[in-house]
Amino acid sequence: MAKAIFGEDFSGTLVRDRYAAYNHIGAHWQACLAHIITTLKGIQREHALLPEPEKDNHVDSFTCRLKDLCSRACDIGQKLKSSEISQKSATRMERHFLKHLNNSCKQPLRFKPAETLRRYLIGPDQKNLFTFLRIPGVPPTNNYGEQSPERVNKNETLFVRN
């Protein structure tokens, strides 16, 4: 479906979540950092419901550090958009973000949802987490797309049905 919309020769940069329909569209893409933050919040809520003996002591610090990292990256995206920082400065920041990300993801986690996210963040798609720092005009989230009239209508319809 996505290829039918974007075409076989799409050469732009998609800002997307991990929805499989977007795989193999375009050479570059930006992972939506807002979706990652939402996933981290969900992991925190779910983990908090576990009985104390089943909790992984590292999950809370993992989720807090990564929420902070993603929020700071989004702030940099805003500063890029408003020209408060240059693209050249932003490009240099990617190493800093990756270093902090990799340090935060060193410890394997027992809580499966957190471990699944940790593996994703250190896996081959890691290069797509901070694409916005390398490619001018690419935002760190797809929040704009989430607020399009079609998406708002779909969200309202789903909300009414529940």
Regions found by a protein language model. Give the residues of each.
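Catalytic center-proximal scaffold of phosphoryl-transfer enzymes
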Residues: 1-162
